[in-house]
Amino acid sequence: MSRTRTTPGRRVESDVVDIGEHEFESGEILPDLKVAYEAYGEFDGQNAVLVCHGLTGSQHVAGHGTESGVSGQARAWWGDIVGPGKAIDTNDYYVICVNVPGSCYGTSGPASEGPDGEPWGTDFPPVTVHDWTRAQRRLLDHLGVGRLHAVVGGSVGGMNALDWAVQFPDDVERLAVVASAARLDSQCLGIDAVARRAITSDPNWNGGDYYGEERPSPDAGLGLARQLGHLMYLSKDSMERKFGRRSAGRGERGDAFPSDPAASFFPYREVESYLDYQAEKFAERFDANAYLYLTRAMDDFDLSEGYESDAAALAAFEGEALLVSFTGDWHFTTEQSESLAGAFRRGDVPVAHHVVESDHGHDAFLVEPEKVGPPLADFVDEGVAGRAVTDTAPDGGEPDEDEDFAPVHSSLFSR
């Protein structure tokens, strides 16, 4: 059932819509794909902004004004960027965020009910980023939204945004890709593979059939997968600053995972305590099968698939593009964003590659709104000519290929 809440400066619509029969890229067909979304602000026919969430995110991108003291997924994942008076201002824009197929926050996925009344489990069709984009397009059709003023995405949500420029190039005026890339590199592919094996090696995973109150969930495997993710999202400098080699009180969480008998002789360190805490909290809110499905979709995405190059894939896009990367992000590097910027430039797409100096790793796009907000706000409002938007090729040309890539760093304050 649709829920609409209106408070001063906030109009929020939250719903799950049955968009009907949906054929996945795999060829499998779901007779009734359900899609969960939240929408903020008022639609005037030209001001729609689609925000694409990250790997384990949800449609809950912005706050409802009643979130004091809440944590986890109950708290908006980008509430410092999206909302009334924020960088993506819901007083000006109609902002939609859609939970992607394969996830577990209301959209159909492995944990949702199948035709037999039981959870799908691993019988749910494989999903791809292309499936996400097409489901979003159908949901927007249901809402009466045609051309989008902007599509904005961070991390794998940035891949989702890029896919919009390929599948529906005429439907997007401005494209903002934050902390993302045209594809994963082999190191990230390897880490994702180990994370999935942590889940499938948990005896409680049981081939993906673990649903029901009487059955234990593969929380240990899912927790280990999440711990790998957190190591991936932080930078070496930020981890050293946050934890160092300091010891922590073992407490209850020190026994969250089996350990060898000698472990009691050695210190239980703060970094271990942090990872155990994150594992515990993640297992409370996420589904292990969904993690398998969504990491597969991310691993599979390749912008140039079916084309000769990234530039060829983007050739039909005639809007403007902003790429935001972070110097401390080794998950999606500034070099990967610069390569992507080159693909846009070769297609004569107005593009800016805005590099932010940060040592917060991949998480910078979530934890440094004071640096992310200004370029996003100005780009959504004004395009690449926005005052706070910088570029690695300030003259609008291509960086000198004979020289090492040297990004133009930015330290930004409020608008």
UniProtKB/Swiss-Prot annotation:
Recorded catalytic activity of this chain's protein: L-homoserine + acetyl-CoA = O-acetyl-L-homoserine + CoA
GO biological process, one term: methionine biosynthetic process
Cellular component GO terms held in the UniProt record: cytoplasm
Compartments (UniProt record): Cytoplasm
Entry superkingdom: Archaea
Active site: S155 (nucleophile), D329, H362
AB hydrolase-1 domain residues: 47-369
Molecular functions per Gene Ontology: homoserine O-acetyltransferase activity
UniProt keyword annotations, A-Z: Acyltransferase, Amino-acid biosynthesis, Cytoplasm, Methionine biosynthesis, Transferase
Binding annotation for substrate: R226, D363
The protein's annotated pathway: Amino-acid biosynthesis; L-methionine biosynthesis via de novo pathway; O-acetyl-L-homoserine from L-homoserine: step 1/1
UniProt cross-references to Pfam families, sorted A to Z: Abhydrolase_1 (PF00561)
Annotated region (Disordered), positions in chain: 383-415
UniProt EC number: 2.3.1.31
HAMAP family per record: MetX_acyltransf
Function: Transfers an acetyl group from acetyl-CoA to L-homoserine, forming acetyl-L-homoserine.
Summary of subunit composition and partner proteins: Homodimer.
Family: Belongs to the AB hydrolase superfamily. MetX family.
Record-given protein name: Homoserine O-acetyltransferase
